């Protein structure tokens, strides 16, 4: 009974805020750009005096990939674009040692997750006590607790190897793409490809890669098994 009464009071309160223009319902959708910038639940806009309700947007897929001769790689994939502050926060709080953390960068008011990267080079854009955050195009790479790997670039794709796992990042804005982009990948090595490029995603499926996350941005091939945790 008390639970129903509290719920009723909450609904009346929310209706009151909406009726008086104090509740910004647009902030409730995950498509709102502001969601990638903060995990705070409630904020008040000082200019509009609207109450903005924000949902946490730091969901990550964590998987263990078995490959090669008894190798197991720990991989974290950001499901949604993250700000640089969130990358550092999640990298310290949730990403374990000896792991790879990849995803897309998004800074509100600075750059869109779909905007072309400012440089074709791989750059270190943030250094922390535990790891460096490297960027390629609009994607980020964190290699935590593992030896640095040599990186090679060609045809809008960055590739490197981490503890026996071959990893490639494909530019989200690269077009057109052809099958020869992926034909150059090692034919038998366990390969993880990360991309938000829809044409590349289709080519990966056609070339026998397996989707391994909810956003269909991470693909695996030549693995023994993988397990999402």
UniProtKB/Swiss-Prot annotation:
InterPro entries: Baculo_ODV-E25. One of its GO terms (cellular component) is membrane. It comes from the Viruses. It is found in: Virion membrane; Host nucleus. It holds the Pfam family Baculo_E25. Keywords: Host nucleus, Membrane, Virion. Belongs to the baculoviridae p25 family. Component of the polyhedra envelope. This is Occlusion-derived virus envelope protein E25. The gene is P25.
